[in-house]
């Protein structure tokens, strides 16, 4: 991972209203790094909203909170990861044209250089990550 990951971490409480705060946090960090914030804000919104909507009442080291981490890679891309305590692994859905949900990971897939999922040890949750090129 990149530089300063511990300094660029936000604990997100289980409330969809805080997604606006997530975007403010992303704007602050990307602004400090001289990066455009549109795509990072969009991807963070989708990943955090997905984590909050699908969170289970699970006990783990992080409790039920969602954690957003931002760092830079060696080639100056943005590494974004969202950690939650839910056991289920997300997957892209084939949303129809009238559906109001189900497009989050499709949006992430369109904008990220790459993205993926890794389960945490002892089945205490997962991390969904995305790498965004500097624009």
PLM segments and residue spans:
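Conserved beta-strand-loop-beta-strand hairpin that lines the nucleotide-binding pocket
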Residues: 1-9, 52-135
């Amino acid at each position: 991972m990149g530089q300063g990951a511990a300094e660029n971490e936000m604990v997100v409480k289980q409330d969809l209203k805080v997604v606006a705060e997530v975007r403010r946090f992303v704007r602050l960090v990307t602004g400090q790094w001289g990066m455009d914030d549109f795509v990072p804000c969009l991807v963070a919104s989708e990943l955090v909203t997905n984590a909050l909507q699908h969170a289970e009442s699970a006990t783990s080291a992080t409790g039920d909170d969602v954690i957003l981490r931002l760092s830079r890679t060696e080639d100056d891309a943005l590494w974004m990861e969202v950690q939650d305590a839910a056991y289920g692994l997300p997957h892209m859905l084939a949303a129809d044209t009238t559906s109001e949900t189900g497009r989050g990971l499709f949006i992430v897939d369109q904008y990220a250089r790459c993205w993926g999922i890794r389960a945490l040890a002892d089945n205490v949750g997962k991390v969904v990550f995305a790498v965004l090129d500097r624009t």
